[in-house]
Amino acid sequence: MVLKKFLKEIQSILPGISAKLTWTSEEGSYSQDMTGVTPFQMIFEVDEKPRTLMTDCLVIKHFLRKIIMVHPKVRFHFSVKVNGILSTEIFGVENEPTLNLGNGIALLVDSQHYVSRPNFGTIESHCSRIHPVLGHPVMLFIPEDVAGMDLLGELILTPAAALCPSPKVSSNQLNRISSVSIFLYGPLGLPLILSTWEQPMTTFFKDTSSLVDWKKYHLCMIPNLDLNLDRDLVLPDVSYQVESSEEDQSQTMDPQGQTLLLFLFVDFHSAFPVQQMEIWGVYTLLTTHLNAILVESHSVVQGSIQFTVDKVLEQHHQAAKAQQKLQASLSVAVNSIMSILTGSTRSSFRKMCLQTLQAADTQEFRTKLHKVFREITQHQFLHHCSCEVKQLTLEKKDSAQGTEDAPDNSSLELLADTSGQAENKRLKRGSPRIEEMRALRSARAPSPSEAAPRRPEATAAPLTPRGREHREAHGRALAPGRASLGSRLEDVLWLQEVSNLSEWLSPSPGP
């Protein structure tokens, strides 16, 4: 009976379908198999032109994909036979990570379902999963003029938001939000499709400020009506594009940007047992009058969504500020070192610096130095998401625990060691001369001048092993004479700093 009701209402569920569906058969067993799955089959006949049929099939595929996103255990075998030619496509996932949102929904969190990125394999800068933030549920109000049944319960909206792809480390490019995708779901996780694909925007969503105060984040939203059905992604019901600001264009921004995913789940809650047909009636009410219901409940809806988006974008905003500060600091450090290198009058000092980073000239030295600083700071300030930290922990311990637990310190150390090994191997090739210099210096006996009391300003080096090396180098520089004291002292100190930089790039042994 439920399946026949589904057939009767499928035209309203999929408004993009122009075909008139005719029930021909219902086959399959309704008893569960060994895996606990209840299979069934529905076959329909349609009579329409091939081009129209192709569009209708795309609409159905999109509907099935949206169901899979919140019901990953369901599998659909979608077959189309046209003029004797049969084509079959299977919709379903196996062993993919999900996140229970607490409202009975298990949401797929693999980013590949939501965005298509040519360079998505760059795991250095982005996590392969989204990390949704669940908002607080609010009750929706039904306008008095909306004709329909009397509901013995409440309509509850629960938002969830996430950035896709999710940044996990500091990269050389600032992350910017380039688009917003909104996905609508009704009771039992059934997709809500509000209108035809020719006019996919309702009055409520045409006003870009109805959901979130985007000006708070200096974002200007424009409704995006160009939704391509012929893509292997779950398509949003509502989409906005973000206009690039002059500030974004003046900085090194990720050209593709991030997408803010916003999931709106509308469910029905009642103090009495809810019948299947009652749920279907609520679903029909939502597909017909959701726009009016959202307008009537505008204040509570905007408050809940704003709170959820604030939590997501505040993290994004703080990360962007930290990245800008880090980039500015790196530029200052590189410029300071370059001023010492180019200002030195000793060719041996400049040659040693270039050899340390295997650079042919000062321009290449600047480029490599900036790259080295950037890579090292990425490893030092690594912000790994809990899923990938746990994944590496599982490989290390060979256990079978959940993937959403919080990381421990040992996991973070494991990641830092793993990420620094490749850079360590590359940089060790430039260090033999440095080690040779240290051996020569340590083999020398201290001269009387080295043992003599130093001026107060000469003891400004920190009281650490590095500081002692600075003082020893300074003492040795005093012996040959006072004429060239300034330049030679500067050369020795900065040569030692370059040496220290080479050592810093190599991972230190564990405690």
Swiss-Prot record:
Q: Does the keyword Mitochondrion apply?
A: no
**Pfam families, per the entry:** DUF4554
Q: Indicate yes or no for the key word Transferase.
A: no
Biased segments, Low complexity type: 440-451
Q: Which UniProt keywords apply?
A: Chromosome, Disease variant, Meiosis
**GO cellular component assignments:** chromosome
Residue spans with biased composition (Basic and acidic residues)?
Answer: 466-475
What segment(s) does the record annotate as region Disordered? 398-485
Q: Which InterPro entries match?
A: TopoVIB-like (IPR028040)
Q: Where is the composition biased (Polar residues)?
A: 408-422
Q: Any idea where this protein resides?
A: Chromosome
Q: Which GO biological process categories is it annotated with?
A: meiotic DNA double-strand break formation; reciprocal meiotic recombination
- Expression sites (tissue/organ): Detected in lung, spleen,colon and in skeletal muscle. Expressed in the ovaries, Fallopian tubes and uterus.
Effect of mutating residue 336 to P:
In HYDM4; uncertain significance
For this chain, the family text in UniProt reads: Belongs to the TOP6B-like family.
Q: What else is known?
A: Expansion of a polymorphic CGG repeat within the 5'-UTR of this gene may be the cause of folate-sensitive fragile site FRA11A. The expansion is identified in the 15-year-old proband with intellectual disability as well as in phenotypically normal members of the family.
Which disease appears in this protein's record? Hydatidiform mole, recurrent, 4: A disorder characterized by excessive trophoblast development that produces a growing mass of tissue inside the uterus at the beginning of a pregnancy. It leads to abnormal pregnancies with no embryo, and cystic degeneration of the chorionic villi.
PANTHER family, A to Z: TYPE 2 DNA TOPOISOMERASE 6 SUBUNIT B-LIKE
In Swiss-Prot or TrEMBL terms, this protein is called: Type 2 DNA topoisomerase 6 subunit B-like
